Amino acid sequence: MNKKAAIIAGVAIVGLIGAFALSGKNKSQETEVKGTEVVTVQDENGTIEVAKNPERVVTFDYGVLDILDNLEVDVIGLPKKSVPQYLSKYKADTYSNVGSLKEPDFEAVNELNPDLIIKSGRQADMYDKFAEIATTVYLSVDGSDYLNDFSRNLDVLGKIFDKEDFVKENLDNLT
């Protein structure tokens, strides 16, 4: 075999090995998605698919934390520096600190291996960094239409955590 043919054969073999490696990875990712029920929700960035009932949740919004607390949904991480008094149980060591509302600690978030990250307007320009770590939902509340935005957030979280009936039954108490 001449030198040119050997180089072409070597490149082809490397390409085939890479293709096989990538095809195996895609199949395992597809299997994981197929085994998980997914819900489609509307956030500030549009329509997003989220695994239903994620277990490892990080939030960067205390309003969302309050909703999750009322829905009896556990979180694993939050910014702990300025947690409101009525949510002070989340200052416990049981919950990981993931930076501040304005300056997330992306390393700390990544180490938690979350299934879902919920962020708000203060982290609006950081969406891509969060999305590299886990599925990220962007929920916010506009002061000019607070009640409608809050109700929408309740609906989104109710759908994600399979608590839609609870939200409907308790909407007056939650708003």
What are these regions (language model features)?
Residues 3-63, 165-175:
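Bacterial Sec-exported substrate-binding components of ABC uptake systems
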Residues 35-37, 53-54, 93-98, 114-116:
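Short, flexible loop segments at the rims of nucleotide/cofactor-binding pockets, characterized by
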Residues 40-45, 49, 98-110, 124:
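Early extracytoplasmic/lumenal segment of secretory-pathway proteins
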Residues 56, 61-108:
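A short, structured surface patch at a secondary-structure boundary
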Residues 113-119, 135:
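Proline-aspartate-enriched helix->loop->beta-strand connector
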Residues 126, 134-175:
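Extracytoplasmic substrate-binding proteins
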